């Protein structure tokens, strides 16, 4: 029988990575990252990537697998994650941890994802037409997809049209779910709003003390300020500071604010899944509680 996949999810700064490491040590397991920015090399401090020592302690997968100038599609991530899970699931219970909802959903739900690689030339042509025109076009060629995509969401609109023009079939007809053939135990970490905000504040200060500004400066020097990843959370604010547009104090305040907003969106996403077992991130015996849940669920799996 295949061992269960253990999933740890929840809002940013809730302590997911720390719990995953502690649990991996206890279960003698491995960790698979489900973070859309930790896949990129050189983006370390601002993505809260596990330290070198932590990665030596426990094998981590799907970290540092792409150059900052490359892109990783959801389909590519899903394929890599599933390969790792299947290669270990007969020996240990792999731990999938992260806050990127779509990465987790692609694995847990077995999302069917069209295998269409990005088409830069087609995307440029579509972008030039304007979002209003594109959305109306999508409504005609794939009304089902258009109902699921916000009229202002240009990225998803263009992706849907891209799949349609490359395959000749609506993206909605190529989607769906193919649930995995192994059991899954989903664990959610969260805490009271004020407590999470304090965690976010502390982590932001720790990132700056650890050299976040210097990391951003090196990345700008090497790749230029127009690198898309430099417009993401934590990096965009420090880029503004380095450009002299805001003070370091303002950059820190903005990072905290934007991280709080991001955490709120993550909480909304994950709370929609009733199969997730939620735990208080500040619980004094968190590791023991989670371990007991896993043991109880494994007993149920064996009995069935």
Swiss-Prot record:
Binding site for substrate: 12-17
InterPro entries registered for this protein in UniProt: Dimethylallyltransferase, IPT, P-loop_NTPase
Site feature location: Interaction with substrate tRNA: 100
Catalytic reaction annotation: adenosine(37) in tRNA + dimethylallyl diphosphate = N(6)-dimethylallyladenosine(37) in tRNA + diphosphate
Keywords: ATP-binding, Magnesium, Nucleotide-binding, Transferase, tRNA processing
Enzyme class label: transferase
Residue span of region Interaction with substrate tRNA: 35-38
Residue intervals passing through the bilayer: none
Keyword Ion transport: no
Listed PANTHER family: TRNA DIMETHYLALLYLTRANSFERASE
Protein name, entry field: tRNA dimethylallyltransferase
Organism encoding this protein: Gloeothece citriformis (strain PCC 7424) (Cyanothece sp. (strain PCC 7424))
């Amino acid at each position: 029988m295949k061992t269960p996949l253990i999933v740890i999810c929840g809002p940013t700064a809730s302590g997911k990575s720390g719990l995953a490491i502690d649990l991996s040590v206890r279960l003698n397991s491995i960790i698979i990252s489900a973070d859309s920015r930790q896949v990129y090399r050189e983006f370390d401090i601002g993505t809260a990537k596990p330290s070198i020592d932590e990665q030596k302690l426990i094998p981590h997968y799907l970290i540092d697998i792409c150059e900052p100038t490359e892109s990783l599609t959801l389909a590519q991530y899903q394929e890599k994650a599933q390969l790792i899970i299947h290669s270990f699931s007969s020996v240990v219970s792999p731990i999938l941890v992260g806050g990127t909802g779509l990465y987790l959903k692609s694995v847990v739900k077995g999302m069917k994802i069209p295998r269409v690689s990005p088409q830069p030339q087609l995307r440029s042509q579509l972008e030039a037409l304007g979002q209003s025109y594109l959305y109306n076009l999508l409504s005609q060629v794939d009304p089902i997809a258009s109902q699921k995509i916000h009229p202002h969401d240009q990225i998803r609109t263009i992706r849907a049209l891209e799949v349609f023009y490359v395959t000749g079939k609506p993206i909605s007809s190529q989607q769906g779910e193919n649930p995995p053939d192994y059991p899954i135990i989903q664990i959610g970490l969260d805490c009271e709003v004020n407590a999470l905000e304090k965690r976010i504040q502390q982590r932001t200060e720790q990132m700056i003390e650890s050299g976040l500004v210097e990391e951003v400066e090196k990345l700008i020097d090497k790749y230029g300020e127009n690198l898309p990843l430099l417009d993401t959370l934590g990096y965009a604010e420090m880029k503004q500071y380095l450009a002299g547009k805001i003070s370091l104090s303002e950059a820190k305040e903005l990072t905290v604010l934007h991280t709080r907003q991001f955490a709120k969106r993550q909480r909304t996403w994950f709370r929609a899944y009733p199969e997730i077992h939620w735990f208080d991130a500040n619980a004094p015996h968190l590791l023991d509680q989670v371990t007991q849940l896993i043991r109880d669920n494994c007993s149920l799996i064996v009995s069935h």
